[in-house]
Amino acid sequence: MKLVTFIHQDKERIGAVDNLGRIVDLHRAYASHLQKVESTSAGDRLAEIVLGRDMVEFLKRGNEALAAARNALDHIASYDVNGGGVFDRGQVRLKSPVPRPGALISAGKNFSDHVAEMASKKGPTAPVAFLKLPGTVIGPEDDIPHPSEVKNLDYEVELAIVIEPGR
């Protein structure tokens, strides 16, 4: 499942990409699922409780939130949802999937192709690691803030691994 954090109408939302490549607002889709399938009128409130308010809360909720997200996506695939919450990619602005993560420990110079592109042309003899401040994480469409004196910016590949509790 591809999880996303996105902005729609100036509001940050958590979502997932459906099998058609659309962005699904998980809160709205799960609330619709609860109202239609579970026959509850408290779908909006229950969706927030089960899924969390943001991606960090969603991830902390673990399997229960993941099951709810799957139900939301199945619901979208099975029903004609008129309440909205399903967007074409161009209708939303993607943010970093986890906009406010905890500690980030990064490995530097870990791809030989990237090392070869760098001026030193020599890989490290020992592992290189560094910390990132959580506020430095941005989305794929965001500008990279930097001082005007900076003439060259380097890129890096990002990979997130979310490990399920008990694994």
List each language-model region with its residue ranges.
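N-terminal non-catalytic cap/leader segment that marks the start of a structured domain
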Residues: 1-125
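Glycine-enriched loop-and-adjacent helix/strand subsegments that border the catalytic/binding cleft
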Residues: 93-167
